[in-house]
């Protein structure tokens, strides 16, 4: 089923006619919808208050806290969609991988996965493993009403990079050594991770997600040839696994200007674009039949109001001929961003694009 169809035999949900979902389906919209990656996070004082003293992973497993954090930017900024508060390594933790999220570092894996014997530690994910996700989605969908809720997961390549490297990496040397040195083990690893990721997304969709985004944070480290050969099959498996639900599927990675066409080819309905490629050029690279999401440089929000509006206007102008456009930043909200600048940005985009 394509993103242009409501689920078979079911009436459209309360969110179906929202500007966000219409844009994802490449339908006419009353205004360009806006949401921000990492909109629920450290840029908000109310987030810092409720998270105080609570480790990141623990906060992702408390349904009422997750719901409150997810709702905060919707209340404050008036964004067109909420995005579920979690972390891409949550499903790995849920299946028993010994990991922690260290402040200022990111996910750290106690025992990296680098051999075939290590693969046995990656068991299947079940809904029972992440019951707190289902509970949080229930709380959120009741509270959000007609506002769409975006679910998300980490893409197989990025999860593999964390598992193989043992944490964040600048050069991904262990990851690439495995990918080039033992292609079969690499393929089996990504296939296993694709199954885990698909299961995690299915839990979110069945609990009420209106759309899902697959984050491939590190895949910009690869050439197009390496992506096509070593990553595309696993990402495609994820998208195919959730294709029957009728919810839009978004794909985003940082530094993926040379991979945009392949991100769409993997099965996305919407391709996220970082700030390095103008949206009109991105549309040429992606090809027809896809909506685009993006792509204001997050650092622009540290400039004055006039500069922000000028750069935003450039993004909107580049999006004029797109089949569908969801306004977003070209990456996540930076932690020290002034939240008032985000609120003004939402208002500006809405005002400038009202049909």
Curated annotation (Swiss-Prot):
One of its GO terms (biological process) is heme biosynthetic process. Keywords: Cytoplasm, Decarboxylase, Lyase, Porphyrin biosynthesis. Pathway: Porphyrin-containing compound metabolism; protoporphyrin-IX biosynthesis; coproporphyrinogen-III from 5-aminolevulinate: step 4/4. The record marks 87 as: Transition state stabilizer. It catalyses: uroporphyrinogen III + 4 H(+) = coproporphyrinogen III + 4 CO2. It comes from the Bacteria. Its EC number is 4.1.1.37. Pfam families: URO-D. Substrate binds at residues 38-42, 87, 162, 217, 331. Signal peptide: none annotated. InterPro entries: UROD/MetE-like_sf, Uroporphyrinogen_deCO2ase_HemE, Uroporphyrinogen_deCOase. Belongs to the uroporphyrinogen decarboxylase family. HAMAP family: URO_D. Catalyzes the decarboxylation of four acetate groups of uroporphyrinogen-III to yield coproporphyrinogen-III. PANTHER family: METHYLTETRAHYDROFOLATE:HOMOCYSTEINE METHYLTRANSFERASE RELATED (PTHR21091), UROPORPHYRINOGEN DECARBOXYLASE (PTHR21091:SF169). This is Uroporphyrinogen decarboxylase. It comes from Streptomyces coelicolor (strain ATCC BAA-471 / A3(2) / M145). The lineage of its organism: Bacteria, Bacillati, Actinomycetota, Actinomycetes, Kitasatosporales.
